[in-house]
Amino acid sequence: MINIAGKLISNKVNNIRFFLNYPKIDIEEENDHVQQFVEVVNKSIKNEVDIFEDIVINTYFEENIIGNVNAISEFQIAFNRGNIISMPMEFTQIIGLTDISHIYSYNYDFNLMKKITLNDIFK
């Protein structure tokens, strides 16, 4: 069984406020290969969050943004059955009234230990 818990990064850098909510996956499986795959997936998700945070900070300083910036990430569990998960995650940067969003979907099959693509679904 796959358990998905939310982790939160909440901090402030200059006038940038971060509320980065991201998933941490845990699986009740004793197989070492599956556990290693779970760690790879968790590191990949955390890496995406870190990259988003870095991009927001770099953009703020490079473009000399005046005013407050809010950087937010949220995820939803769209599917979690039979060791297959699908979680869309939205990364949003709000500068004044301007909203820039990017949605990325994490789709994994922990039985096959691989990322699922549309080609896998529609064979």
Could you say what each language-model-derived stretch is?
Residues 1-123:
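Compositionally biased intrinsically disordered regions enriched in Thr/Gly
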